[in-house]
Amino acid sequence: MEFNDVLTNQPICIDNGSGVIKAGFAGEDQPKSFFPSYVGRPKHLKIMAGAIEGDIFIGNKAQELRGLLKIKYPIEHGIVVDWDDMERIWQFIYTEELKTVSEEHPVLLTEAPLNPRTNRDQAAQVFFETFNVPALFTSIQAVLSLYASGRTTGVVLDSGDGVTHAVPIYEGFAMPSAIRRIDIAGRDVTEYLQLLLRKSGTIFHTSAEKEIVRIIKEKCSYVTLDPRKEEKEWINASISGGKDYTKEEEFKLPDGNVLRLGAERFRAPEILFDPEIIGSEYSGIHQVVVDAISRVDLDLRKSLFGNIVLSGGSTLTRGFGDRLLSEIRRLAVKDVKIKIFAPPERKYSTWIGGSILASLSTFRKMWVSAEEYQEDPDIIHRKSI
């Protein structure tokens, strides 16, 4: 099959998230495949002939058998730390999820900005040499989120499981020198919630139980507008024996026990705005946005403040947008108009943006072909967004 013929095939778009991987065919409005990006291996000895076959589990099967498995994420803070497992996940996407062959479809792959060059080099090597893809294109996640929102100007705040970054884009031009990134995101919130629950007497220690903590975080946590005031209210409620304090929430654990959640619900996501709580020297998420905007030309700042677009699972936390707005107001120039857009589909917006971009006929010249890659592997750094 000629290269140009292969390029007319539907591209595959893979949003390679630290916590959740999204994959599907370009041109579709949502990913066909969506599952936690971990690999599970049985941690117990198999003694019965009828036991489940296989020694590696990925996707929904890994979620179902979570309690039997040792769970490992191959991506940490946006960077692949285990390439063998990463390759297994990509293979699983092709064979089990999309049910297609890698040789016939170009691939659009996402990655976090300011990642080490070696991460992209290795990914390209796997796709071209192991999967024999006809063409590849690598894009920064935030840029695609802006595509999905239908804008060409804005600052995208993308906070997923491993990385939080703010990327200013003006009339379609990304500004690499203004990109700000912090390695504090959803997984750190999960780990801190795990610690807070341990302090209150509920211990989750296995890798599978940590997944339960993640679900508790997603269902029960919220961001408060005023943490000091909220803290006082909780302290007063506990002093007055407030067992029925209205903000307490119950969560039913898989074994049927009920967990009562108190102040942990807002204390855990608070680390996004105040990373010092966990001893980190990173700036808060609101500071990251303002820093990114303040690094661009004075003339452009006004329109960026008026177009802040949220993306990624961590921004779905209840109260996140309101708190972000109030914190940015405090840091920004007095009369500047601040508008935050929170698209309802922002959990998938990077993938949706990639799907739109890869299906454009004008995008065809952007692909890095296998032939170009063989001649000059460095081209994947030059031909990218």
UniProtKB/Swiss-Prot annotation:
It comes from Pneumocystis carinii. It is found in: Cytoplasm, Cytoskeleton. Belongs to the actin family. ARP1 subfamily. GO terms for cellular component: cytoplasm; cytoskeleton. Transmembrane segments: none annotated. This is Actin-2. PROSITE patterns: ACTINS_ACT_LIKE. Its main location: cytoplasm. The keyword ATP-binding applies. Keywords: ATP-binding, Cytoplasm, Cytoskeleton, Nucleotide-binding. It comes from the Eukaryota. The keyword Calcium does not apply. GO terms for molecular function: ATP binding.
